[in-house]
Amino acid sequence: MEQFRNIGIIGRLGSSQVLDTVRRLKKFLLARHLHVILEDTIAEVLPGHGLQTSSRKLLGEVCDMVIVVGGDGSLLGAARALARHNIPVLGINRGSLGFLTDIRPDELEVKVAEVLDGHYLVENRFLLQAEVRRHAEAIGQGDALNDVVLHPGKSTRMIEFEIYIDGQFVCSQKADGLIVATPTGSTAYALSAGGPIMHPKLDAIVIVPMYPHTLSGRPIVVDGNSELKIVVSKDMQIYPQVSCDGQNHFTCAPGDTITVSKKAQKLRLIHPLDHNYYEVCRTKLGWGSRLGGGGD
């Protein structure tokens, strides 16, 4: 197992609970004589911290591991910035769900100590890369750990588009939009739209239409190495948008092409040894417990 000596900390802004947890984490890491580096945005709201700071973009170059304090959204943002550095990322949950940030604040010291002592699991989560092209020229690019979404923006009209997989025409659709999700994102927006839950170890991508104008419009699971192409109808009178993990919005014009494929770099997500994906799903999604009151 790797030795972590230089630890980066990213925290969600706007929460006093996050700041309290960051202070606890900082104190704990310094007590173990580790080098702690704060992301510059969280450092600005921690006066007198006395630590080295770094931009998120460069944090992956100076750290052995980065700990994210916040919710899943905070980790999504960190993943897009850190995946290219192949650096392990650990999440402490200060959000509402915690599919990705799975360490509770009350167990911070115990679980982080286990990880630092080499007792942890590593999951490699792949990201998607999206590109919007107009007349063969790229007008927007973005990465996503969860999903790439084509949606109508402020318009209430449906979008008409064609779907191609690996150069082969699949279908045309008229829908409120389209979600292209990773296994990580299968428990996010795609799940709300009726998509399947995919285990994070699967090498697959799910395509989920949003309120399609046909009963046969159903989610499709394809090979993770597939290249997807979505062509917006030239007859559209609205300008739909493409978003990556709810960020990096690009406005499309009729006739634009959106290409989505797997990104070469992956996120190295760290979990404590007792991490159980099905327990996380059962807890977060309200699945039933064992029959007969047997607990977990």
From Swiss-Prot:
Gene3D superfamilies for the chain: Probable inorganic polyphosphate/atp-NAD kinase, domain 1, Probable inorganic polyphosphate/atp-NAD kinase, domain 2
MF terms in GO: ATP binding; metal ion binding; NAD binding; NAD+ kinase activity
The EC number(s) this enzyme carries: 2.7.1.23
Cellular localization per UniProt: Cytoplasm
Keywords: ATP-binding, Cytoplasm, Kinase, NAD, NADP, Nucleotide-binding, Transferase
A single GO BP: NADP biosynthetic process
Active site residues per record: D72
Cofactor: a divalent metal cation
Amino-acid positions noted as binding NAD(+) in the UniProt annotation, renumbered to this chain: D72, G73, N146, D147, R157, K174, D176, T187, A188, Y189, A190, L191, S192, Q247
Spans through the membrane: none
InterPro entries, A to Z: ATP-NAD_kinase_N, ATP-NAD_kinase_PpnK-typ_C, NAD/diacylglycerol_kinase_sf, NADK
Recorded catalytic activity of this chain's protein: NAD(+) + ATP = ADP + NADP(+) + H(+)
Cellular component GO terms held in the UniProt record: cytoplasm
Family: Belongs to the NAD kinase family.
Function: Involved in the regulation of the intracellular balance of NAD and NADP, and is a key enzyme in the biosynthesis of NADP. Catalyzes specifically the phosphorylation on 2'-hydroxyl of the adenosine moiety of NAD to yield NADP.
Protein name: NAD kinase
Organism, as annotated: Pseudomonas fluorescens (strain ATCC BAA-477 / NRRL B-23932 / Pf-5)
Encoding gene (name): nadK
